[in-house]
Structure formats: C-alpha cells, structure tokens
Amino acid sequence: MRLLALLLLIPACPQGTGNGYCEQDTDCSGGQICARDMECIAPGDTRGVKTTWTIGGQAADATTCATMPNFYINFYGADPQDAFGFAPVPCMQGQFFIDKLPTRFDQVELGSDGHFDLVRRVDASGMASFDLSP
C-alpha cells in the first residue's frame, strides 16, 4: 500500500532536479538556472557571448546586407550533435548577444543560405567576430 501511495505521488513532484528541460529559472532547483538551450545548469557554467559581424570591413546596414538580409546563428561544443541556434537573425543588427549560454558551447556558426557558412571560436572575453565577404 505504501508503494502504491509513493507511486501516486511521484508524478506530482516537480521536474527541477537538474539537467532537465526548462523554460524559466523557476523550473530548475538547487540554485540552478535555465540556460538558453533550455537545460537546468549551475550559473557558473554559463556566460554571455556577443557575436559581431561586418561585411567587407563595413558596418552592417541596408546597403551591405542587401544580398543577405537574414542569417542563422548556431552554437556548438566539442560534440557536434550538441548544438542549438536561432534564425532568422537580421544582418542589419551587426551583432547578436546571448546570455546564459552554457560554457561548453565554445564555437559560433554564422551563415546565410547560399552565401556563406563560417565558424569562429568564442574568445576569453566572450566574443566571436566575423568579417563577411560581400
């Protein structure tokens, strides 16, 4: 009977036991936060990363971005299967900032279908910079 009562209670327990799926910090427990890849992780295992780009050495604007108005951005770690990203990312922004990125993601891929696909390492200051060819 006790086993049955325990089994009935288990589904009511919150998922926040660490390394689980989350949508916000309150979905996590034990001082963990919800990283941008939707996993619970210790705050010290995350960082902010800023990706910037220019086109032929020029600032991103309506003229320099005319042939490629939107990009995709992906973040990778040592395991190529461990990745996630965002699209569309407007070229004219000239930058993309992400906070609460797990530190295991140490590479940024910036691409535009039919134009380019480049990868850079995130440097010690949390930056990845690209100069794209027009």
For the regions a language model picked out, list residue spans one by one:
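Short, disulfide-bonded extracellular cysteine-rich repeat modules
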Residues: 32-43
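A short, solvent-exposed beta-strand micro-motif common in secreted/extracellular proteins
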Residues: 94-98, 102-114
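Short, ordered, surface-exposed loop/turn motifs in non-cytosolic proteins
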Residues: 57-82
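Structured interaction patches on ligand/partner-binding surfaces of diverse proteins
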Residues: 89-90, 111-134
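Disulfide-braced loops of extracellular cysteine-rich modules
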Residues: 21-33
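Bacterial signal peptide processing site
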Residues: 14-17
